[in-house]
């Protein structure tokens, strides 16, 4: 038993000595393996391109988008990185393009008479991937950044509403909309404020026509992007 207590005493002394020799961890020191800008939220305005003759946007056509991007640095100083993730976008388009109630792709028209509302709302799930440059350091979250990439968007919901001339139309699930959208974007700025532009590379409609001509409108969005963490 005496040998047991002797061994136990030696073990305790050794353990206490090892603990005293352990280096202290400074939780306030900068993290050299940091990641940046993994959550984002943005607000932009749609300016439709390649619109049919007579098309006009009414009021403001806003976009709200948000999501998560995994930041994957590719150099030692972590100023270059690849970002990839998942997002969601809601776009509201106020315009004078009349969308047929029965989904007939040949019945689209430019509205001539007065109306109170003519609005198309679309929701997209988005997969962005981008290359990132930033003048960041472990000590500061205030820096210049330039991010550019491609975004793949999948239509998950759409709703069209018209109100005017004693007529009200509400329609969901328009089959003429192209479910798959893709485009290029750029985000650049300092600290909190970042300019954002997006250019759609394919039309939002896949089979709609006006007077026998295909509607090849695509989106050009300009706005602001904010990054968190």
Positions of predicted regions on the chain:
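Bacterial Sec-dependent N-terminal signal peptides
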Residues: 1-24, 224-229
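Short loop/turn motifs that connect adjacent beta-strands in outer-membrane beta-barrel proteins
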Residues: 25-37, 73-80, 136-144
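Predominantly the C-terminal beta-signal and adjacent terminal strand-loop region
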Residues: 29, 34, 173-229
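Transmembrane beta-strands of outer-membrane beta-barrel pores
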Residues: 43-49, 86-94, 133-135, 150-158, ...
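Surface-exposed strand-loop-strand hairpins of Gram-negative outer-membrane beta-barrel proteins
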Residues: 46-67, 173-176, 205-207
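Outer-membrane beta-barrel transmembrane strands
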Residues: 51, 117-137, 144
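Extracellular/periplasm-exposed beta-strand and loop segments of Gram-negative cell-envelope proteins
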Residues: 52-59, 93-103, 108-122, 155-183
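Residues on the lipid-exposed face of transmembrane beta-strands in outer-membrane beta-barrel proteins
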Residues: 66-72, 86-88, 127-133, 148-152, ...
């Amino acid at each position: 038993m005496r040998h047991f207590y002797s061994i136990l005493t030696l073990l305790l002394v050794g353990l206490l000595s090892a603990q005293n020799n352990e280096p202290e961890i400074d939780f306030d020191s900068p993290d050299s393996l940091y990641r940046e800008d993994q959550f984002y939220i943005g607000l932009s305005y749609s300016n439709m391109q390649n619109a049919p003759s007579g098309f006009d946007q009414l009021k403001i056509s806003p976009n709200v988008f948000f999501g998560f991007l995994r930041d994957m640095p590719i150099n030692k100083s972590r100023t270059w990185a690849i970002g990839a993730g998942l997002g969601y976008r809601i776009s509201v388009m106020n315009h004078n393009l009349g969308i047929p109630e029965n989904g007939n792709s040949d019945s689209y028209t430019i509205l001539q008479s007065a109306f109170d509302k003519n609005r198309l709302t679309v929701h997209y799930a988005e997969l962005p991937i981008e290359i990132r440059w930033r003048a960041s350091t472990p000590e500061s979250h205030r820096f210049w950044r330039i991010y550019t990439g491609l975004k793949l968007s999948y239509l998950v919901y759409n709703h069209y509403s018209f109100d005017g001339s004693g007529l009200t139309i509400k329609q969901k699930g328009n089959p003429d909309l192209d479910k798959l959208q893709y485009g290029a974007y750029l985000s650049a700025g300092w600290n909190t404020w970042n300019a954002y532009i997006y250019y759609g590379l394919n039309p939002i409609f896949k089979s709609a026509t006006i007077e026998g001509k295909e509607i090849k409108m695509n989106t050009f969005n300009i706005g602001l992007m904010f990054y968190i963490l």
